[in-house]
Regions:
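Conserved catalytic segment of ABC-fold P-loop ATPases
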Residues: 147-150, 163-165
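Acidic, glycine-centered active-site loop in nucleotide-sugar glycosyltransferases
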Residues: 164, 169-172
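A generic "structured core" feature
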Residues: 151-153, 157
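Terminal amphipathic alpha-helical/low-complexity segments used for targeting or macromolecular assembly
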Residues: 1-64, 106-109, 131, 171-180
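Active-site nucleotide-sugar/metal-binding loop of Leloir-type enzymes
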Residues: 160
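Conserved short histidine dyad/triad with adjacent acidic residue
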Residues: 51, 73-74
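Flexible, glycine/small-residue-enriched loop-and-beta-strand segment within the central core
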Residues: 58-59, 75-146, 171-173, 178-180
Length: 180
């Protein structure tokens, strides 16, 4: 059991080191800053996550660093990346359905074999353009742009950019219709 715990500890240290480098922190104080930043983000996310009031959820997400436009609506349990919220940009008139998820990073957290070059960390901005609708249960992965007035169908996994005025469906999501 100690070998497994050692692997978890090594992976945790590696994740912490990557986060410190990304934010420009170093040393013991940098490690402290990262932990405080994460705890703050987690608390604000938990408040937003289960809020039935969209305006409150949006204010909490903005406090975390998510860029959110005007007239947006977030349903309860919409999840926005915990580690890199500042890389998520949501433009005006966007709707996020319940249990939809937006990730600005992908990273195997506990498996050192995957982490050491076989499955590299990907950290990239996610942009949801004006008028887009992200339906319940949809997942938006890192580096994706969802086009203007596009609709992501329920349960879809978006791994590539979505053009403007389209409906996408499936895993992975593909365009099934243009909206005129």
């Amino acid at each position: 059991m100690s070998k497994y715990n050692d692997l978890i500890d090594d992976a945790t240290k590696l994740n912490e080191k990557e986060l410190m480098e990304y934010h420009g922190y170093s040393g013991t104080f940098g490690r402290f800053q990262i932990r405080i930043k994460y705890i703050n983000s987690w608390i604000l996310h938990r408040l937003a996550f289960s809020s039935a009031h969209s305006g409150f959820a949006i204010r909490m997400q903005k406090a975390r660093g998510v860029k959110i436009g005007k007239n947006c609506h977030f349903n309860p349990y919409a999840f926005i990346d915990l580690i890199y919220p500042e890389l998520v940009q949501i433009e005006d008139n966007v709707t996020l359905g319940s249990f939809s998820m937006i990730f600005a990073h992908s990273n195997p957290t506990a498996n050192l074999f995957l982490k050491k070059g076989n499955y590299p960390r990907k950290v990239a901005e996610v942009i949801i353009k004006s008028g887009a609708v992200i339906n319940p249960g949809s997942i938006i992965t890192s580096g994706v742009t969802v086009g203007k007035n596009s609709i992501v169908s329920p349960g879809s996994v978006v791994t590539q950019d979505v053009p403007d005025h389209c409906v996408v469906v499936g895993n992975p999501a593909r365009v099934v219709r243009k909206i005129e």
